[in-house]
């Protein structure tokens, strides 16, 4: 990141920041994408089992990685304010937190996964695959969480191309392992959805190893000497980190868990409905990588400018990110409307699943506009380190409005499973509106402070 003087320079720098993040997020999502699509071609039961396992794993992993994402705005502001010497201590303390969080998640999972799955009244093969999926994916928790911290450091320096290269190097490993283990090729046993979990866990370890090697040997990362000194754990540092990270993590958890909750509540419907819902939701999540990547770029750009006390520049980056998100939303809506048949065919050859997935995809169109506003706005707010209000707004939008309304529509109207999608759409729209209002308030506050000073 560097200081810019014109809107065109900001737009160019933002795009150069965003594009590698986008490729990275798409590559990381591709692991889940290939898990789902390749499991679906193994059998509808494997697809449903992976869907249930993923619906439990994703909210937990994204919520906790969200806490660790506090690394990015903290480091970005330190770099913007010329306090490079403080960065190694922040990163090492965050790594300690990541490892501790990993063991806590694994311990909790040992006692909760089986009761949760038993209470869902799933078909026995689906429950078995989901349980095995979750048991095996736990092997990848430590490297995933640790990598999240190190990636936050790399991205905060504006070197998003590096994380892109790391992920692109790792993706082929995941695809090959999926091909070998899901379908039983090259003499390996045919494991179905369970093979997808093994592939993902192994890939997480590969990503961490590559990242550590780059930080130790390549500039500008090596000049920070991140691993030169293993600082003693500092509870005060953990407290400061968590003060920012916990609201970020819970906001992400509330958003991702609402979709997982819908998938779990759909366990009362048929395996066909679960599989179709998962296929449509998986593709909608694929499109979500764009506003998510824009949000991550906004956190870096806004955080850097706020650290340097250039508040008008931070405001302009906010407008750039939201404008690009809305443009992509229009493009994706057209894609979903005209190519729903082709999209559904990616996930399944089962006629019933294919037909129902097409119906769900139409609702995904309505997700696009709300996501294009809410997600980048949250990224900008994180750059300002303004996270508490966003947490409350997200909780209300998704869990007080979206899910209860979806349940009512699914249970007491003819919309059935589609009622959940309608509830989510209304909740997302509410959240987007109020998050945008909050961003305007924060921008006005900082701009006013700048004028007075």
UniProtKB/Swiss-Prot annotation:
State whether keyword Metal-binding applies.
Answer: no
Q: How does the protein associate with the membrane?
A: Multi-pass membrane protein
Q: Which InterPro entries match?
A: MATE_fam (IPR002528), MATE_MdtK (IPR050222), MdtK-like (IPR048279)
What's a Pfam family this protein contains?
A: MatE
What residue ranges are annotated as transmembrane?
13-34, 49-71, 92-114, 129-151, 164-183, 193-215, 244-266, 286-308, 317-339, 359-381, 388-410, 420-442
What Gene Ontology cellular component terms go with this record? plasma membrane
Coarse class of the protein's main subcellular location: membrane
Judging by the UniProt lineage, the source's domain of life is Bacteria
Keywords assigned: Antiport, Cell membrane, Ion transport, Membrane, Transmembrane, Transmembrane helix, Transport
Q: Name one GO molecular function term.
A: antiporter activity
| Similarity comment | Belongs to the multi antimicrobial extrusion (MATE) (TC 2.A.66.1) family.
| Stored NCBIfam families | matE (TIGR00797)
What function does this protein fulfil? Answer: Multidrug efflux pump.
* Name listed for the protein in its UniProt record: Probable multidrug resistance protein NorM
Q: Which gene encodes it?
A: norM
